[in-house]
């Protein structure tokens, strides 16, 4: 099965409740109350407009800044799979610079922000909405996101499809 975004958020919050971390972004639809935010470095904010590919670079930049100020915080990038796929060069930088980071990928098998936009444009222009996913869905074949992490020199786990397996992976 699939793990829903709310379940993922709650499991992540529980698994990391005692961690000192800097969340650099969260995917569209992530519940805003899922994480305790008390310090300016707890959460850097959203990337604005769901811009694909920005998340990994923002996370690496944050990790470098935290290293510079000698912070003990771990950088956590909660990304959609589209953002992750478009930002693999930044993922490689995280590995080569040995940055203490966690990339948590919420995989909906889509460049969803763009797919959703395509649906709205199709509706507005009276075009078939069933064509909107063309070039937006990441299926057949679905990329092996964990293998891509390993190919960059990082550890990679997944896909995790059972909520019971999630805490150990985090």
Describe the residue ranges of each PLM region.
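General structural feature for long, well-ordered alpha-helical segments within catalytic domains
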Residues: 4-12, 16, 39, 87-90, ...
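Active-site diphosphate/adenylate-binding microenvironment
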Residues: 1-69
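Short gly/pro/ser/thr-enriched loop/turn and capping motifs at secondary-structure boundaries
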Residues: 30, 51-52, 84-85, 109-113
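Short, solvent-exposed amphipathic alpha-helical segments in soluble enzyme
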Residues: 35-41, 91-97, 119-122
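Thiamine diphosphate
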Residues: 96-170
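Short glycine/serine/threonine-rich phosphate/pyrophosphate-binding segments
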Residues: 54-56, 83-90
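A short, small-residue-rich loop immediately preceding and capping a beta-strand
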Residues: 69-86, 101-106
């Amino acid at each position: 099965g699939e793990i829903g975004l709310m379940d993922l958020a709650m499991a992540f919050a529980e698994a990391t409740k005692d961690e000192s971390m800097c969340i650099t972004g969260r995917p569209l639809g992530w519940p805003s109350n899922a994480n305790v935010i008390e310090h300016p470095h707890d959460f850097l904010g959203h990337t604005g407009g769901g811009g694909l590919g920005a998340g990994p670079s923002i996370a690496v930049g944050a990790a470098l800044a935290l290293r510079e100020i000698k912070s003990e915080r771990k950088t956590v990038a909660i990304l959609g799979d589209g953002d992750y796929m478009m930002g693999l060069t930044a993922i490689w930088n995280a590995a080569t610079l040995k940055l203490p980071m966690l990339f948590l990928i919420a995989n909906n098998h889509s460049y969803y922000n763009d797919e959703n936009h395509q649906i709205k444009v199709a509706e507005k222009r009276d075009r078939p909405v069933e064509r909107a996913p063309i070039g937006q869905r990441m299926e057949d074949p679905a990329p092996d996101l964990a293998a891509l992490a390993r190919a960059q020199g990082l550890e990679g786990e997944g896909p995790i499809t059972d909520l019971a397996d999630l805490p150990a992976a985090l």
